[in-house]
Amino acid sequence: MNILKVFGMIFVLILASANLVKCEELNIYSHRQPFLINPFLEEFTKKTGITTNVIYSTKGLAQRLRSEGKNSPADVVLTVDIGRLYIYQDMDLLSVINSKKLSENIPEHLRSLDNTWFGLSKRARIIVTSKDRVKVGAISRIEDLADPRWAGKICTRPGSHVYSRALMSSLIAAHGLEEAEKWATGLVSNLARRPQGNDRAQVKAIYEGQCDIAIINNYYFGKLKYSDKEDQRTWARSLNLVFPNQGETDRGAHVNISGGGVAKYSKNKDSAIKLLEFLTDEFAQNLYGEINFEYPVNPKVEATSELQSWGSFKEDKLPILTIAKLSREAQKIIDRVGW
């Protein structure tokens, strides 16, 4: 009988150990490419012992999470663009998180009011101009791009892209629907070619003389500057950077975020919260800048020396959720003006 009790206790301990091991593993649904997030996850595992599995896709993860429901293996969602984060919130796919560290590390305007998603890094939407063909100081505000003096001089990616739509939303927030549409009409009138390609393609077009001015996310400049391809490094050397709307009374440059949240039906919420907290601490915040030239959301962490060398800038501190809420109106304007 004693032997049976001993074996029984051993069996219970084995089961308990198995459950503990199971809990020390996180499943991550990610819109971010593996090479961008793996260095973070490797360090997180070293620090905590919690291992991670990543399912990566550029689209369809929210729909997958919804269809899986309570049976979903997902613990953490990582994505880029406030519009995508808002989809997860709107579909009720994220857990409400109470974390003092997240509240301290992330400014209020870069996280959801209900604590379901959190900004993890920032990227500024900036203007780049040809060093040879546009004088320094000729453009200082995003609104300047609608000035007829730049007719036939501007290249952009399609207005329907999430980055363009977010910028459009920021202009609606700043000026209202009517003035924002006037700006979009002016911008389209100034385009040198049909909107096409990604931000890298706009820089190439400037170098090739197809246009003189473009709108890009700041990290594209870093990627080109340090590219292993000589031609792309040459493109970067042909540019001046303009952080728009920096005047003393102006609102600052439009920013977007990468961000994340804990899946609603996560079985490992405590570990999932630990990961989000880790991503807002100093080590990870610096890593965002070193790997992808993104700015820290944590106000206690300085931008990397490389980012600082591009110049300091003031950001538009509009609550980032406003960008997502105005997305539909922004798209309507984009469609009407043919951007």
Predicted regions and their residues:
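A structural signal for short loop-to-beta-strand junctions that line the ligand-binding cleft
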Residues: 72-77, 95-127, 143, 153-155
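Short helix-loop capping/hinge motifs at secondary-structure junctions, enriched
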Residues: 132-140, 172-181, 266-272
